[in-house]
Amino acid sequence: MWLLLVCVVVGGFYTAWNIGANDVANAVGPSVGAGALTLKQAVLIAAVFEFLGAVLLGDRVIGTIESGLVAPSGHVLSSQDYVFGMTAALLATGVWLQIASFCGWPVSTTHAIVGAVLGFGIILKEDAVIYWNSCGRVFVSWLASPIIGGYFAFLIFSFIRKAILYKKDPVSAMVRIAPFLSAIIIFALGLVLILSGAVAPVISFSPALRIVCGLSLFAFFFTIWGIRFFKLAILPQEVLPGTLLDRLLSKSTDYGRKYLIVERIFAYLQMIIACFMSFAHGSNDVANAIAPVAGIYRTLYPQSYSSKVLLVFMSLGGLGLVCGLATWGWRVIDTIGKKITELTPSRGFSVGMSSAITIAAASSLGFPISTTHVVVGSVLGIGFARGLRAINLRIIKDIVLSWFITVPAGAALSIVFFLLLRALFC
């Protein structure tokens, strides 16, 4: 069985690598597309915060996928079938995510792993193995994710345009409103961490909420101080070439330069969002790769399973996320940040705030939503705020198609790998 365990660990790293290549774009894609961060800066920031989130808080979410959708109870599912099934789920998820990343499709990692887990449950022809009620609840929440995310993004960006961008003096309007925006985004991002349960092992709900409120208050006053000493004269070379801001600067008027100052402030706020979203993603999505590994190890070696072993697995998963982002992450980042619709920092900020609010609200209601669907829906909402012509409908068609086939693709690949493993090891 040690050879099978080696295959499982390698498969876990491979899956984490592909999660990093595909899913991390949710955190940094809008920032890169808006020009707030270069691709290298985004990769560096995401690498640090993804790894920290995976190692420090990743263990909280691992039990959900390990036992939340498929029952490994001895009287229903034998240990051998459970090991083969979870290994097949790992490999199926990794392969499908690699295909999607190569094509630049931002698909849901959770869709893929759930489809893969359901696949081996179906091949066993044991309805008792699968918790169908939980699966149905998950599917309903996933369908709602892009709609809710897009709606919030539309409202937030419409407010920003009316309250700041369309004013005669957008800089003065931004100075008044920015402290409130920074406080709200810190509060929303903090709620994402609290309500997802990621910080539960470290601190209880009430103290965590007080800390988040304190950080929001600090962000409010720090933003007031920061804007007061902000360098208002922004030089052209500070704007990334090829972005929408670069084209605006080439036609610069007095209003245009004020608009550029406002966008630069939004760029700093967007960097904060990228850091928080990367940390939250690392703490949550490392479970998609590591939960099957942990479950298999505990089944094969129950006496030696401990928190130290889990920490090693989480570190391996965090390293896989970073490697995947650094190698193939640019493909999906390009899709989310540039190909759906043109983004500026104010639009990217609206995407980030909408995503944080949607995820926090869903977590408080107990809905395990797809972050990918929320972010893509939020980007779409920004596009709709500017009109249908602002959206690349061909890219949207490809993305939606990839969403529909992710679950069945994961299930089909899982069945193939399950049968192969049975043939090899039985």
Swiss-Prot record:
One protein family per Pfam: PHO4
Keyword rRNA processing: no
Residue intervals passing through the bilayer: 1-21, 37-57, 83-103, 104-124, 140-160, 183-203, 207-227, 260-280, 309-329, 365-385, 399-419
Gene Ontology biological process terms, A to Z: phosphate ion transmembrane transport
GO cellular component: plasma membrane
GO MF entries: phosphate transmembrane transporter activity
Keywords: Cell membrane, Membrane, Phosphate transport, Transmembrane, Transmembrane helix, Transport
Compartments, record wording: Cell membrane
InterPro entries: Phos_transporter (IPR001204)
Membrane topology of the entry: Multi-pass membrane protein
Role, per record: Potential transporter for phosphate.
Family note: Belongs to the inorganic phosphate transporter (PiT) (TC 2.A.20) family.
Protein name: Putative phosphate permease CT_962
Organism expressing this protein natively: Chlamydia trachomatis serovar D (strain ATCC VR-885 / DSM 19411 / UW-3/Cx)
Phylogenetic placement of the source organism: Bacteria, Pseudomonadati, Chlamydiota, Chlamydiia, Chlamydiales
